[in-house]
Amino acid sequence: RKVWCASSTHNTEENFIGLVHKKLKTKYNNLLTIIIPRHINRIYEIENQLKQLGLKTHLHEPNKKISDETDIYLVNAYGQTKSFFAISKNVFLGGSLINHGGQNPLEAARYGCNILHGPNISNFDEIYKFLNSQKISFKVQKQSGMLKILNKLLSSKKNNKKDIRNKIYSKGKKV
């Protein structure tokens, strides 16, 4: 099953992700999108928004299996991010489509994930410049941009997690 993750999302970003999921699902009918909101107290609001888009959601329960029909897996617990980065090749980092300044991309990069982000990344500008230069992160502003990049990444047979980790560790040794 194709899996990708949206982490540290903020209000309005989950709806954006839901719409992207719907469009990607026309090509990848078994796609699973994992959403880890920045503020888990919003989980039921997010779930309702996604259901209004016609998406099937599943709230995170560690020992409960999800169905093949699940579109969006909603994580409502802190400290789970690394588990989902480990199984996702591609991660969108929230707080970047809104005027928040973005989220730290180093954890996702350390797990070898391709990173998608919006234009508002001023809190971590220098790190994103490096990641963009290495083709580890990709800036998106609109659904069409995210669809184009995710489609390319999801259709790739190459698993470049090791390559990404090596680039990060190599840069870390130089610092």
Question: Which residue stretches match the model-derived regions?
Answer:
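Nucleotide-activated sugar donor-binding and catalytic core shared by glycosyltransferases
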Residues: 1-175
